[in-house]
């Protein structure tokens, strides 16, 4: 029993610590990529090419004073960042990085992830209410409405994948897409693929869906009153969720750790590449897409975001799920 606890704790640390480092350097990549897109240089002072900038940014945040607003609910004010941070990292417990390399290979892995990503909104809403600030409250209410609107579309997209794969286990979904690129689900489930990723951008409150913390309207939204390490927890949760959406999109629609050259003549050339490399390469594409979209599109109005979710994404995903269910039932399509 003790050995199991120690092994599990070690595995958790092997996931969480590298993930936090990736999050730190994802912020560096964001500033660099957007800088180049806007014909700027980006961070280049701290260390060679600015590579130490994330480390010093983290030190700056964690050394700052934690200020508690007057008349705020002190207990809820302190617990809200933890409620946002913990689910964002707990969701990684069921992510397989390669065959057998997973902390907990659940049969209901997708359901667990959906529950964890939905739970993060409680931290945001509590932060908005406990801060005793109208701007925080407005941001929290916007976040709640946005999550409800786009969680449904994401849920329907996941249902389509589950129907196609015949499994809610993440490993089962990846194995169902083995056999080369033509077996990946982004082809037959293309509308669900597009909707899932866009809904993931909205779910993480990233541009152009960042009305939750729209600077020109509500300053910084739900975390306007947070400083130091408490603000850093919200920051770490947001970027961890972005990476989670990227890796889930790779797993559900691009075959996960499967090589695109399976069952082709090129497999003999690329067969030596480990599955984890393919998974990280696909994930990196979507991580870049988050940054590209932010640098390209202006912020949508709140009514436009609601209209897109309720009038376009939800009906589209619902109809496509019905089509997928009928095709699976009739045995149509080479992907199943």
From Swiss-Prot:
Catalytic activity: a quinone + NADH + 5 H(+)(in) = a quinol + NAD(+) + 4 H(+)(out)
Keywords attached to this entry: Cell inner membrane, Cell membrane, Membrane, NAD, Quinone, Translocase, Transmembrane, Transmembrane helix, Ubiquinone
The protein's name: NADH-quinone oxidoreductase subunit H
GO cellular component: plasma membrane
Gene that this sequence comes from: nuoH
One GO MF term attached to the UniProt entry: quinone binding
UniProt function note: NDH-1 shuttles electrons from NADH, via FMN and iron-sulfur (Fe-S) centers, to quinones in the respiratory chain. The immediate electron acceptor for the enzyme in this species is believed to be ubiquinone. Couples the redox reaction to proton translocation (for every two electrons transferred, four hydrogen ions are translocated across the cytoplasmic membrane), and thus conserves the redox energy in a proton gradient. This subunit may bind ubiquinone.
Classification of source organism: Bacteria, Pseudomonadati, Pseudomonadota, Gammaproteobacteria, Thiotrichales
Membrane topology qualifier: Multi-pass membrane protein
């Amino acid at each position: 029993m003790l050995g199991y606890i120690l092994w599990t704790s070690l595995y958790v640390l092997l996931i969480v610590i590298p993930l936090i480092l990736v999050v730190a350097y994802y912020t560096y990549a964001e500033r660099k990529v957007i800088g180049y897109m806007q014909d700027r240089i980006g961070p280049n002072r701290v260390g060679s090419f600015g590579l130490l900038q994330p480390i010093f940014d983290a030190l700056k945040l964690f050394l700052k004073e934690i200020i508690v607003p007057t008349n705020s609910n002190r207990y809820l004010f302190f617990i809200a960042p933890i409620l946002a941070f913990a689910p964002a990292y707990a969701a990684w417990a069921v992510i397989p990085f390669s065959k057998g390399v997973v902390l907990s290979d659940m049969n209901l892995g997708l359901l667990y992830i959906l529950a964890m990503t939905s739970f993060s909104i409680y931290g945001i809403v509590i932060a908005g209410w406990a801060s005793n600030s109208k701007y925080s409250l407005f941001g929290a209410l916007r976040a709640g409405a946005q999550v409800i609107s786009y969680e449904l579309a994401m849920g329907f997209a996941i249902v389509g994948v589950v129907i196609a794969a015949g499994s809610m286990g993440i490993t089962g979904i990846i194995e169902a897409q083995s056999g080369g690129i033509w077996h990946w689900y982004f082809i037959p489930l293309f509308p669900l693929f597009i909707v899932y990723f866009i809904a993931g951008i909205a779910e993480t409150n990233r541009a152009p869906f960042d009305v939750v913390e729209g600077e020109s309207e509500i300053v910084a939204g739900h975390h306007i009153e947070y400083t130091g390490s408490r603000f850093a927890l919200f920051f770490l949760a947001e970027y961890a969720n972005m990476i989670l959406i990227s890796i889930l999109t790779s797993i559900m629609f691009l075959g996960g750790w499967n090589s695109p050259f399976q069952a082709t003549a090129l497999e003999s050339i690329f067969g030596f590449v480990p599955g984890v490399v393919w998974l990280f390469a696909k994930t990196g594409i979507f991580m870049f897409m988050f940054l590209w979209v932010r640098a390209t599109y202006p912020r949508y109005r709140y009514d436009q975001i609601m209209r897109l979710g309720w009038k376009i994404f939800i009906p589209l995903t619902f109809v496509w799920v019905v089509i997928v269910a009928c095709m699976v039932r009739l045995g149509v399509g080479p992907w199943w």
